[in-house]
């Protein structure tokens, strides 16, 4: 979502730089449809609102003819955007059990993103992992790692996020200027390094990846769940 918001605030030139393949399409369209038609089409596309969000819960009000096992009136969780009414493919929906509240089911897709990062990291009982970025997905990643018997370190520039993670058992470090997070991680692992790093932060540079790699032991696992150049 942060990337979408940042993209939306960019001017046309910066948007073009971020989508070089689309620029080629624009050039081809100019040769076939002319400049004015192309300009109007591009402007319409770039100024079209994009719904945010990717995790919701709601009641089914209509189903397609080929949909199976989901019917009108069912309560489902999906990866659709935040809106009053949405259309979602069946393979991106799941029935919500009766004993699960809407407030709990709303975490389904977000938690699955965190869980996918953990699945790729293949943590083992007693291993130490560092989570870079303690936003919603980062915090869920920490909790899931703790539930698997891992030691969890968390880093984030926001002190409130660090305090929240610390409240359920994560060793945290508020990062900023002159903060050596690599030595901090090495000191907590007796200079061995962490067994793995999961990056759930959105960054404009490769710094989170580079620092996470330095904090890992030899043959440690590095998983990028967030975004980095």
Predicted regions and their residues:
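Flexible, gly/ser-rich surface segments that form the specificity/activation loops bordering the active-site cleft
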Residues: 79-85
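Short, surface-exposed secondary-structure boundary micro-motifs
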Residues: 63-65, 81, 134, 227
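Short, compositionally biased
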Residues: 86-100, 149-150
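Aromatic- and Gly/Pro-rich amphipathic surface segment
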Residues: 5-50
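Glycine-rich cofactor phosphate-binding loops and adjacent beta1-alpha1 units
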Residues: 163, 168-229
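Mid-domain Rossmann-like dinucleotide-binding core that forms the NAD(H)/NADP(H) cofactor-binding site
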Residues: 75, 101-178
């Amino acid at each position: 979502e942060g990337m979408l918001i940042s993209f939306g605030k960019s001017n046309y030139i910066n948007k073009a730089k971020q989508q070089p393949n689309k620029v080629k399409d624009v050039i081809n369209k100019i040769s076939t449809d002319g400049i004015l038609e192309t300009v109007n089409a591009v402007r319409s596309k770039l100024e079209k609102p994009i719904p945010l969000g990717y995790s919701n819960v709601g009641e089914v009000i209509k189903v397609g003819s080929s949909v199976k096992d989901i019917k009108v009136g069912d309560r489902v969780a999906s990866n659709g955007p935040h809106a009053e009414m949405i259309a979602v493919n069946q393979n991106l929906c799941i029935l919500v059990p009766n004993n699960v509240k809407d407030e709990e089911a709303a975490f389904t897709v977000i938690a699955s993103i965190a869980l996918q990062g953990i699945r790729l990291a293949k943590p083992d009982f007693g291993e130490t992992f560092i989570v870079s970025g303690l936003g919603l997905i980062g915090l869920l990643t920490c909790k899931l790692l703790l539930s698997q018997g891992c030691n969890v370190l968390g880093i984030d520039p926001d002190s409130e996020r660090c305090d929240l993670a610390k409240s359920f058992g994560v060793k945290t470090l508020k990062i900023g200027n002159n903060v050596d997070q690599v030595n901090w991680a090495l000191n907590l692992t007796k200079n061995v390094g962490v067994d793995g790093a999961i990056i759930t932060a959105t960054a404009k540079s490769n710094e989170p990846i580079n620092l996470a790699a330095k904090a890992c032991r030899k043959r440690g696992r590095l998983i990028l769940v967030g975004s980095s150049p």
